[in-house]
Amino acid sequence: EIMPSLVGSEMCIRDSMTTGNLPAGSQSLSSDMREQMTVLAYTDPIGKVSKETVSGHLMIGYDDLYSIQYFQDNRMPYWKHDGKVDIHQAFEKGEASYEDLMRRCGSFDSSLMSETSAVGGKKYAELCAIAYRQAIAAHKLVTDKEGTLLFLSKENFSNGSIGTVDITYPSAPLFLVYNTDLLKGMMNPIFYYSESGQWKKPFPAHDVGTYPVANGQTYGGDMPVEESGNMLVLATAIAIVDGNADYAAQHWEVLTTWANYLLKEGLDPKNQLCTDDFAGHFAHNTNLSIKAIMGVAGYGKLAEMLGKADIARQYTEVAREMAAKWVKMANDGDHYRLTFDKPGTWSQKYNLVWDRLLGLNIFPKEVAATEMAYYKTKQNKYGLPLDNREDYTKSDWILWSACLTGSMEDFNALMVPVWNYANETTSRVPLSDWHFTSDGTQRGFQARSVVGGYFMKMLEKKLGK
C-alpha cells in the first residue's frame, strides 16, 4: 500500500500535521522556504484517538546501489547478496517479518539492559544503551569478490577516513562481546592491504581511504606503534573470545612483522602520531609504550595457542622485560608519567586493561592499583581528563580505565561521572566521545563508533575476569 506523501519545507509540513492531512499535489518553495530544511512526510490514516488500541508502522530505507569502492571494485551492500535482492524485495520481506523482527528487537533490548545492569548497574546500562546502535551504525557491511566480510567504519566528524585502525580498536569491546566476525570484518581490509603488497611498510596502515572509497591510505601521517599494537592486541582478543587462534594463523606472517617492529620501536616510542594526539604528538609516550608491550605479549599468547612454544616463550619473556623497564622509566612516585622524560605529568593508562582481561599478566598488579588511586584525585564533575595537559577527555577511554583493577568500587568511581556527562550535557548532538570534564560540553566528535568501547565491562564479564 502506498501512503500519502509530500516533499516540502519543514514548516509547511509541520503545520499540516496539526490537521492530520498533507496538502494535495507538489509544493513550490518560496525563497523563505528554501532556507528551511526540506523534508519528506508520510501519513498513515489509522483513525481517531479512542480507547481501542490501533497500531501502524512505516518502513523507510535507502538504496545506495553500491556502498563502497574497495580497491577499485565497487561493492554492493551486504543485504543485496551480490544483486540477488533488490530494495523492493527487502521491503516485502521486512513487512512479512515485521512482527517477528519487532519481537526479536524487543527481546534483545531487554536482554541488553538486564545484562549490562547486572554487570555494571543501571547507569552503566543506560550508557551502553545509547552507545550500542551508534557504534554499529557508523559502518558499512559489504564483502569482497571472494566473499570475505568487510565491516568498514567511517571516521565521523574528524577526517572521514574509512577503515581506520584506531577507530576499530576503541570500538572493539562491543564486537568482542556480541560478534567477533564483525571485528574481523574491520581488520580484514588492513590485513589485505599489507598482504597484497600494496602497503609495504613494517607496520599497519592507518586507514584504507576516505569514505566511501577504500583504495588505500589517504591520511597524511602514519601511526606505526599505535596501529601495530592495535592489530596485535585485537587479534589476541579475538583468539581468546573464539577459543582458537585460527584467524591469527591466517595472518601470521604480517603479525610477525608487526610484532618485531614493536620489539624494536615500542618500548620508548619516538615522536610519532598516536590516537590521542589532540594536544600535539610527542615522544616517549608511556601509554603508547604499554600498547606496544601488550602487542608483543599478545603475539606470545597467540604463538602459545598455535603450538609455537619457543616463539611464545621468547616474546612473552621479552614483554616482561619491557614491562619491568617501563615501571622504572615511568615511575613518578604516586603515579606514572605521561612521558618517560617529564616528571610531574600523568595520563590515563587505558591500554593496560588488556593485561588483566586477556590473562597476559605482564605488569605487576600494583601498577593498575597505583594509577587508579591517583585517577580518583584528578577527576572533575564530568569525568577524568585524558591527561594533565587539558581539561577534556575521551569517554571511551574512561570506561576502559574504569576496568583496570576489576574493583566495582573503582569502576563506579570513574563510570558515574561519564553518565553524568551523558545525562546533563547541554550539547544536543549524537553522543560525543570527546568532551570537557569541567562543564560537560562537547569538545568535538560525535556519532562515532568508538563508543563501542563502553562495553569493556561487559567484555570483562564475558572473559570471566
Question: How should each PLM-predicted stretch be described?
Answer:
Residues 125-130, 136-144, 163, 196-205, ...:
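Aromatic-lined, polymer-binding surfaces characteristic
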Residues 88-159, 181-192, 197-200:
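Low-complexity, Ser/Thr/Pro/Gly-enriched N-terminal "stalk/linker" regions
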Residues 1-8:
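Single conserved hydrophobic/aromatic residue that forms the stacking wall/gate
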Residues 54, 80-102, 160-269, 285-303:
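Aromatic-rich carbohydrate-recognition surfaces in CAZymes
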Residues 61-63, 110-118, 169-181, 230-246, ...:
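Well-ordered alpha-helical scaffold segments within catalytic/enzyme domains
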Residues 28-48, 138-164:
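Asp/Glu-centered strand-loop micro-motifs enriched in Gly/Pro and often flanked by an aromatic residue
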Residues 252-276, 280, 307-349, 358-465:
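Non-catalytic carbohydrate-binding regions of carbohydrate-active enzymes
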Residues 10-99:
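Beta-strand-rich recognition/accessory modules
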